[in-house]
Regions:
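Short alpha-helix immediately C-terminal to the canonical SAM-binding loop
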Residues: 159-161, 231, 235
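A short glycine-rich, Lys/Arg-flanked "PGG" loop and its adjoining helix->strand segment in the class I
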Residues: 207-223
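Short loop/edge segments at beta-strand edges and connector loops
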Residues: 90, 179-181, 251-253
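SAM/dcSAM-binding transferase cores
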Residues: 2-20, 26, 30, 236-291
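Conserved hydrophobic residues forming the short capping helix/wall of the S-adenosyl-L-methionine
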Residues: 81, 166-167, 239-242
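Conserved beta-strand signature within the Rossmann-like core of class I S-adenosyl-L-methionine
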Residues: 220-233
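Conserved SAM/SAH cofactor-binding pocket of Class I
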Residues: 104-203, 210
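N-terminal auxiliary segments of SAM/dcSAM-dependent transferases
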Residues: 2-94, 98
């Protein structure tokens, strides 16, 4: 997962209690830079993630309405979490650090890769968050990019109930909550190869995610997986699965941080060809028998 501390500028009243100093905040700011790969061929030996860019918190870039929507979402998340297992995090500042900033960090790889390799702007992106859980990162991305159409895909009914509540509470009109499994919806013509971008965070290993997500992505679209600081072995193991789904590994986008959580990586895949009709396999098979 991508996890970062948030920083509020001096002239902004932060909505959440922050138990640390401004000097500590500045010290923990993240940085990001893409590491490009060949579009059609992956070189395993070249899978490096040494990068440094981006120097500020993402929360502070949101306007006042978006910040209020985030506040409402976080409040609801912690309230509902007392009744159901939505997150292991119990405190507001931890939610901001481990979930909100983490989710917003995915925006940079999406923007950079989409504009560079998909031959179009990032306006009106159709994005699906596979295995969204509590709405991370999809609901947060929908707040940050109201011009995007975001689908939150979740198999558990109780989580879908929470997601519907959160969407209503925050007043989002660009979000659709869908209850279902990726293995089934990957064969549904209303979902198969209908999305510009698929994202997944803290769901499964890359071999499994490729089969879950890439059948939902249109040819020429992207799949972005949020992973840990050193995903190279996982990426190498997933090369065959990615290729079988009609895609290629495009780049690793690494975020460098001095926070206790260290460096995190977004793995970006480009959909080159249609996914063969036999994929995804039956529900449960990708997890039990990864490609």
């Amino acid at each position: 997962m991508l996890m970062w501390l948030c920083k509020a500028p001096p002239n902004v009243q932060f909505q959440f209690p922050l138990p640390f100093s401004a000097r500590t905040l500045i010290k923990h700011l993240p940085s990001w830079k893409p590491n490009p790969f060949s579009r059609h061929r992956t070189n395993s030996k070249a899978l490096t993630t040494t990068t440094r860019i981006v120097n500020s918190s993402h929360f502070e870039t949101l306007d006042s309405r978006q910040q209020e929507q985030i506040r409402l979402y976080v409040d609801a998340l912690l309230q509902w979490n007392q009744k159901m297992n939505l997150t292991a995090v119990k405190e507001v500042n931890e939610v901001m650090e481990r979930h909100i900033e983490d989710s917003l960090t995915i925006l940079a790889p999406i923007h950079k890769s989409y504009t560079s390799h998909c031959n179009t702007s990032c306006d009106k992106i159709r994005l699906v968050d596979v295995g969204t859980g509590a709405g991370l990162p999809g609901l947060v991305l929908a707040i940050a990019r109201p011009e995007w159409n975001v689908t939150l895909l979740e198999s558990m009914n109780k989580r879908c109930v929470f997601l519907e509540h959160a969407v209503s509470l925050t007043g989002l009109s660009n979000v659709k909550v869908v209850r279902g499994r990726a293995e089934n919806l990957g064969h549904n013509l209303g979902f198969r190869e209908q999305f510009d971008v698929a994202v997944a965070r803290a769901v499964a290993e890359m071999r499994i995610l490729a089969e879950y997500c890439l059948p939902l992505v249109r040819v020429g679209g992207l799949f972005v997986a949020a992973k840990g600081h050193d995903p190279q072995e996982e990426v190498r193991n997933a090369e065959r699965a990615v290729q079988l789904m009609g895609a290629s590994l495009l780049q690793l986008c690494s975020v460098e941080s001095q926070s206790p959580y260290g460096k995190r990586t977004a793995i970006v895949c480009l959909k080159d060809h249609p996914t063969p009709k036999k994929y995804p396999r039956d529900p449960g098979t990708p997890a039990k028998m990864p490609l």
